[in-house]
């Protein structure tokens, strides 16, 4: 009888562990679209982020009430790292176009997520995706400077280092030029293409 209850307890804990993570992955995948171009600055985060936050709060309330502290820690530890790496993966593979306002929206999404995560996981942060968005905001020169300073790996650690390869860094740089390449003036487009191509070569050299 005791072993049966222990097996049931283990099954429940594993289910809770997987449930919150699948909810996170689904919500973040919904949040990151192929195009995040917003006409005007928005004061509220993406609806999918608000929904995710609601789920996180409800989940944390239930689990912290009924699950012992050691098991609670096992269920909730690593949620921030999961979000950070998955968002970085989505933005470096799925995202095809983003403007300044779209980037600002994503940064707001991160801020809201991070504040909520700190109530669940001590010291929770999203450093890698924050760096990606900060570099987009800073522009192509900052991306090239980062590649020059850190070379292969882009100064990241662990799985993030493996994700932000030379090709992904180039993709980030190309994202910063999307708006300029839509300019109606042909000479402006040609100039932007020249600058982009030269900087792509620099990234190849620095991250080889």
Provide a role label for each language-model segment.
Residues 1-208:
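Extended alpha-helical "rod" scaffolds
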């Amino acid at each position: 009888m005791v072993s049966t209850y222990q097996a049931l307890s283990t099954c429940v804990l594993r289910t809770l562990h997987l449930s919150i993570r699948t909810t996170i992955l689904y919500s973040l995948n919904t949040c990151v679209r192929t195009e995040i171009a917003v006409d005007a600055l928005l004061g509220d985060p993406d609806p999918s982020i608000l929904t995710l936050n609601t789920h996180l709060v409800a989940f944390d309330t239930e689990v912290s009430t009924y699950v012992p502290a050691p098991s609670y820690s096992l269920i909730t530890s690593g949620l921030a790292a999961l979000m950070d790496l998955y968002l970085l993966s989505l933005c470096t593979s799925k995202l095809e176009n983003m403007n300044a306002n779209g980037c600002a929206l994503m940064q707001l999404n991160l801020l809201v997520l991070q504040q909520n995560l700190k109530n669940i996981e001590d010291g929770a942060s999203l450093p890698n995706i924050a760096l990606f968005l900060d570099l987009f905001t800073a522009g192509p020169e900052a991306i090239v400077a980062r590649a020059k300073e850190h070379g292969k790996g882009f100064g990241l650690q662990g799985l993030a280092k493996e994700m932000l390869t030379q090709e992904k860094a180039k993709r980030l740089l190309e994202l910063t030029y999307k708006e300029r390449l839509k300019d109606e003036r042909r000479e402006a487009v040609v100039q932007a293409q020249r600058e982009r191509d030269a900087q792509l070569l620099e990234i190849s050299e620095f991250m080889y």
